[in-house]
UniProtKB/Swiss-Prot annotation:
InterPro entries: Nict_dMeBzImd_PRibTrfase (IPR003200), Nict_dMeBzImd_PRibTrfase_bact (IPR017846), Nict_dMeBzImd_PRibTrfase_N (IPR023195), Nict_dMeBzImd_PRibTrfase_sf (IPR036087). It holds the Pfam family DBI_PRT. This is Nicotinate-nucleotide--dimethylbenzimidazole phosphoribosyltransferase. Catalyzes the synthesis of alpha-ribazole-5'-phosphate from nicotinate mononucleotide (NAMN) and 5,6-dimethylbenzimidazole (DMB). Its EC number is 2.4.2.21. It is an enzyme of class 2 (transferase). It comes from Shigella flexneri serotype 5b (strain 8401). Pathway: Nucleoside biosynthesis; alpha-ribazole biosynthesis; alpha-ribazole from 5,6-dimethylbenzimidazole: step 1/2.
Amino acid sequence: MQIIADLLNTIPAINSAAMSRAQRHVDGLFKPVGSLGKLEALAIQLAGMPGVNGIPHVGKKAVLVMCADHGVWEEGVAISPKEVTAIQAENMTRGTTGVCVLAAQAGANVHVIDVGIDTAEPIPGLINMRVARGSGNIASAPAMSRRQAEKLLLDVICYTRELAKNGVTLFGVGELGMANTTPAAAIVSTITGRDPEEVVGIGANLPTDKLANKIDVVRRAITLNQPNPQDGVDVLAKVGGFDLVGIAGVMLGAASCGLPVLLDGFLSYAAALAACQMSPAIKPYLIPSHLSAEKGARIALSHLGLEPYLNRDMRIGEGIVQALAMSIIEAACAIYNNMGELAASNIVLPGNTTSDLNS
């Protein structure tokens, strides 16, 4: 779809001059150089994003949760009933799920988006972007057509950009869909070139005696559909799912506005791999909240070249951990904007020179 290609070509590059200025500012704060480690690096990374105009800050925060069912559920790759997708989506509208609780704690609005839930009627309270009642069973057919994938990508990109116009400066992604770690593993396997056995995990507590079947399903899906690992849309359409497409759309939309996106868990890594195939320029805008305990997590993040901020043995979706990590973003902004400067107190520490502080 040409309109998507045109939009991706407008994704702004990170402002290296702004990052250099931010580096000098951070080095001149009341602390030894580098003593705040990755928090300093995060503040500098944020400063380079054109959407924040050189000064790391957080305005409105939005978590976009993509909800969809998956035809591959029929292959016995998940233990939860498929109906749980719809039930939990309804619970999100009541604010009682994990992502809603932690997003509220972080002061973020949760946007629950139906991109493919398998119900006869749309669920009240959800944002309706439904493409179909669940994706195709990737073990026997493509997840969707390329046209469907491109249309959903564009819809989500436009929705994300509209939120940015209305003051959102920090985006987070989440997902909901029974069996969705299976297509996620298929995407990771396809793009990284790793064998399914290396990336397929137990997801939402799949019994280990069923893991061999899940690995076989992923292998069959890739063999049957032959996704092109260089074409992110092709991978999403053939072995992905509507929720994964939606997550990729948020990343592309936020990056096109020069704004950061907090990744959540394994599903978001898979979507990021596909999105980066569409536009490598989005990578500096992606902030990994944590290292998921799902088996293929390290492989996916390593391929992306991203180092997570948290590692607490969590293996859960919804956007729960990225909501928790929003406080890290705010902490990076706080130290940048509110800490005092050494130069103002005539303090010179090893590694901080007068010329550095006055640059």
